Swiss-Prot record:
UniProt keyword annotations, A-Z: Cell wall, Cytoplasmic vesicle, Disulfide bond, Secreted, Signal, Vacuole
Disruption phenotype: Compromises aerial conidiation and submerged blastospore production. Does not affect radial growth and multiple stress responses.
Induction: Under normal conditions on SDAY medium (Sabouraud dextrose agar plus 1% yeast extract), hyd2A is up-regulated at transcriptional level during the first five days of incubation. Hyd1A is the most active at transcription level under normal culture conditions, followed by hyd1B, hyd1E, hyd2A and hyd2C in order.
CDD domains: hydrophobin_II
Pfam families referenced in this protein's UniProt entry, alphabetically: Hydrophobin_2 (PF06766)
GO cellular component, one term: extracellular region
Family: Belongs to the cerato-ulmin hydrophobin family.
Name this polypeptide is given: Class II hydrophobin A
PANTHER family to which the protein is assigned, alphabetical: HYDROPHOBIN
Localization (cell): Secreted; Secreted, Cell wall; Vacuole; Cytoplasmic vesicle
Gene encoding the protein: hyd2A
Main location: secreted
Disulfide bonds: C30-C79, C40-C53, C80-C91
Amino acid sequence: MKSVVFASLIASALAVPTELAPRTDVSSLCPAGLYSVPQCCATDILGVARLDCKAPKQTPRNADEFKNICAKGGQQAACCVVPVAGQSLFCMTPVGI
């Protein structure tokens, strides 16, 4: 009986990966819920509405990369409600920027 328990502990220890693969987690950039869409926007109106918004051309891995991807196109990183016709009426600054 003890050997079965010992063998199962060894098997489960060997099954655990030794190294985690790097992940791209866009959900950490923008909060879940209403403001969950990462966008690069050209115009900021009083910190609430954003105009000429587009999805980032690359998938950012963190807040600094998100900011830099948008800055390459002369735009600002934002977390928005689902945009309609390029107009994101409700946006906020991403977490970590």
